[in-house]
Amino acid sequence: ERGYLLTVKLSRAYSNLAVLGDHGVHGTDGEVDEDLIRHAIDLLESVRTQGENDPYWNSRMGYSCLMAYRSAATAYEYAKCWLALAPDDPAAQKLVRDCEEYLEEEKALELDLKEREEIIRKETPDDVKGGICK
């Protein structure tokens, strides 16, 4: 039976393989192997009760979630836990800052999209609106 530490290290190996690829399979396209990253997260979930208060577990969960969901919201929660458990860790501080930047970018893109939709609504004649969206 695999212990806690081995499970977390195995998860890291799967996460690295998902992001970096196997001998350049992913090349430089930035794609993440979704099956492998999901498996990495599943491994971490299997030891959640032992890991929730472990800075390393939270770091691995934060990085893996950031890669898996391409959204910083979930990763940010784990990054904050990691930072709370290891406030002097520069890597934890960096992940928190990175997630905050990603969240700001997502928010700006969402606001930009809403503004564009509003402009289109205002500039589209009512008879065209009725013909497009019934």
Describe these PLM feature segments.
Residues A40, A75, A92, A108-D112:
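Solenoid-repeat scaffolds in large eukaryotic assemblies
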Residues N16-T28, R70-A72, C99-P125:
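Alpha-helical linker/edge segments of TPR/alpha-solenoid repeat scaffolds
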Residues R2-T7, E117-C133:
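N-terminal alpha-helical interaction modules that lie
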Residues D29-D42, Y69-A73:
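Helix-turn-helix repeat elements of alpha-solenoid scaffolds
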Residues G3, S46-V47, C81-W82:
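Canonical positions in the second alpha-helix
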Residues R2-G27, N53-M67, K94-E101:
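Amphipathic alpha-helical repeat scaffolds of TPR domains
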